[in-house]
Every structure is written in C-alpha cells, then in structure tokens.
Amino acid sequence: MNYSLKQLKVFVTVAQEKSFSRAGERIGLSQSAVSHSVKELENHTGVRLLDRTTREVVLTDAGQQLALRLERLLDELNSTLRDTGRMGQQLSGKVRVAASQTISAHLIPQCIAESHRRYPDIQFVLHDRPQQWVMESIRQGDVDFGIVIDPGPVGDLQCEAILSEPFFLLCHRDSALAVEDYVPWQALQGAKLVLQDYASGSRPLIDAALARNGIQANIVQEIGHPATLFPMVAAGIGISILPALALPLPEGSPLVVKRITPVVERQLMLVRRKNRSLSTAAEALWDVVRDQGNALMAGREGDPLYQI
C-alpha cells in the first residue's frame, strides 16, 4: 500500500476539525483537494474512514481508530525531527582532530585554547601522529578532520590551505653560514645535514628543493621527532632545514636560523573526507583552526625574519 505523509496529515486534520473546509483552511488546501486526498486514502486502505453529511464529517469506527493512532505517530515523528534538528545545531560533544608533531606542538595549542573560549561544551581531542597516520585516520573516519602538510593530489579528500610558510636553515652560531643574511641552497653542497625522516610531510619538499638546486645531499642523521633537530645541530653533528612553525629556538641555545634562497614554502592544509558532512561541532572547530592559521600568517607580516 502506498500512502503519503501528506495524506495522513490531511486525514488527521479532517478528523480533528470534522470539516473539509476548516481542515483545508488550516493546512492551506482547497476543500476539493482535502476531499480528494481523503478519498485516495480510503481507496488505499479499502476501508471507509468518514461519513459525509451536508453539515459535518463523522468518523467511522475504522476512521476513529486510525485517527487516534495516526495522531500519536505524527506527534512522535514531529518530536523526532525536532530532536534531530537540535542535535544538528548542537555545539557540544567530542571532536577528534589529527595533526603531525610540529603542527601539534606549535599551532594546535592555540586552536584548543580558542575552541575552549568559543565553545566550552566541545571537547577538542588531539591525535598527535606522523602525517601518513593522519591521512589514513581521516580516510578511515577515525578522526573528524586533520591538519597536514600539502599532500598533493588526493581525489578522496577535501583540502583547504590555511597557512603558507618558508623553510629556514638551522645552524650553530659558530658556523660560517651564521654570518650570512641569506643562505643560497648551493651553500649546502657537501654540508652535513640532519633532517627529519619520511614520517614528516616536509621531507619530500626538502628533498625536491635540494634536487632542484643540484645539491648532492650529505645526510648524516635522519630523526623522527622535530625537537631532536635542535640538540643535534647544537652538538655540531650537522646543519638542518626546518619549517617556520618549528620556531622559536630553544631558549639559551647556541643556534641561529637563516632564510634560504630561493624561497621554498610549504602549505598547511585542513583535510577531511570528501562528500562527508562534518558535525556542527566539528565544523566549528574547523573554522577555529582556519582562523588561527590566518592569525599566525598575519602576525608574521611585520617580522623581519620573514622578509626577503
């Protein structure tokens, strides 16, 4: 049997008003349209639901039973839809966000603090992992969204750039390179390099920049955690290349950073599954992360370190 929700609502309204004309006025239909709708419902059920007189509409026993049950069902349906609407607008609950270590250490704390200020009922849950794990966790739906270094073409994901930043040379203050205002990539030829391994989203960009400038990389150490770069370089093991987000330098360290020319930048991106809606709470935190990325970019505009 094929009933429409509209037919059921029309019938219940007629049962309540005991009049086709009053029911039509209440729901915005003509009297003939109301009568036709009820007649179709009777045809579908095979049961007479109303007795029509010149002055009023009288429910049959079957019509009375159907009207009572439909009223309860329609009330429950309306209540369910209202609850669903409130749930969709709710700015509370748990939002799972994944980011690589440098991003987690130097951007996400501000994001969490701002989310607590704006949305105290949303729990910002951070998963601090290597980039490849972040990408897979987004694809598998284990997190709501992530922040990564530009992953390149990814047809199954939706990406939004929130921050562009340069790479710097990290060296000991006693290094010959420390006296330069800007260091050309060619100056790294033959130098001992301490770099992050391929768990970092920045490593492919650094490799590409070295190759593009004809540098035969002399990599003496590859490390997993970005904070390890600082003591390695401070100990004289080599020099390094690191993104702006890894700054500032540890307090009291014998290290300096220099701009490398020509400039090579990386992009930080918000990433989510394509064609999948975020919850209202997750959308709110997505906006918070975007805003913090934009604020960080704006705060660097007057810093001489970022001027070439």
Swiss-Prot record:
The keyword DNA-binding applies. GO terms for molecular function: DNA-binding transcription factor activity; sequence-specific DNA binding. CDD domains: PBP2_LTTR_like_4 (cd08440). Pfam families: HTH_1, LysR_substrate. Residues 20-39 bind DNA. GO terms for biological process: regulation of DNA-templated transcription. One of its GO terms (cellular component) is cytosol. InterPro entries: HTH-type_LysR_regulators, LysR_subst-bd, Tscrpt_reg_HTH_LysR, WH-like_DNA-bd_sf, WH_DNA-bd_sf. The keyword Cell inner membrane does not apply. It comes from the Bacteria. Keywords: DNA-binding, Transcription, Transcription regulation. Signal peptide: none annotated. Residues 1-60 form the HTH lysR-type domain. Belongs to the LysR transcriptional regulatory family. This is Uncharacterized HTH-type transcriptional regulator YfeR. It comes from Escherichia coli (strain K12).
